[in-house]
Amino acid sequence: MADIIVAIDGFSGTGKSSTAKKVARALGYTYIDSGAMYRCVAHYFIKHQIDFEKEKEVAAALDKILISFQFNKMLNTSEILLNKKIMDYQIRLPEVDEIVSQIAAKPLIRKAMVDRQKKLGLEKKMVMDGRDIGTIVFPDAALKIFMTADLHIRSKRRQKELEEQGIQVNIEEIKKNLAKRDDLDANRLESPLIKANDAITLDSSYLTLEDQVKKIVDIAKKIIHEG
């Protein structure tokens, strides 16, 4: 048996985070939401009115940003903390959606986050989801999954997620933001969203969350036992 890293990449709204959380739980692995790290940066920049086009401001802000993870035993889930404060709906708001891809495309920010992510993966036994996990962060990961889904279905999922938090957003606005983010993610110069050559594609459009998790866990267990 071998300890491995499971890298799950894909577009926003494909169910990466929900799937990755449950895969980690099923394997007894640590779950790291890399996208939430960039969302924490975006939230901090909005709150403190940081101009992400100015490198000196960005560098100074990054020095003040502490991102950490903890496991909540009562809720049986992983939580992300920004400067020791648990982040939840704050980093999923439309205002964060609008700028997170632009922030993630900045080389200074990207390098800082990737360096932190690589340190988190030193112990292996981890599931990390994002957009460049299998290509940049952990190119040697034993299992790489690339998730896709229909844009309208992704928009409905995001709308439901926001409504459950009491936030009402028009689905067309969500669809517009997702399409814009898809384009920014796929075409940015720094760590673009592309499928790794050895990644397995998983279209989640018409799969239940349980189906997605089972497919990945079955593959992961086979790799772990063969290792």
Annotate each language-model stretch with its function:
Residues 61, 72, 117-124, 131, ...:
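Small-molecule kinase domains that catalyze NTP-dependent phosphoryl transfer to phosphate-bearing small molecules
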Residues 6-8:
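Hydrophobic anchor at the beta1->P-loop junction of P-loop NTPases
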Residues 88-165:
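ATP-dependent NMP and nucleoside kinases share a basic, alpha-helical "lid"
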Residues 26-92:
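N-terminal phosphate/diphosphate-binding loop that engages ATP/GTP or pyrophosphate donors
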Residues 17:
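Walker A/P-loop
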Residues 14:
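ATP-binding Walker
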Residues 11:
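P-loop (Walker A) phosphate-binding loop of NTP-binding proteins
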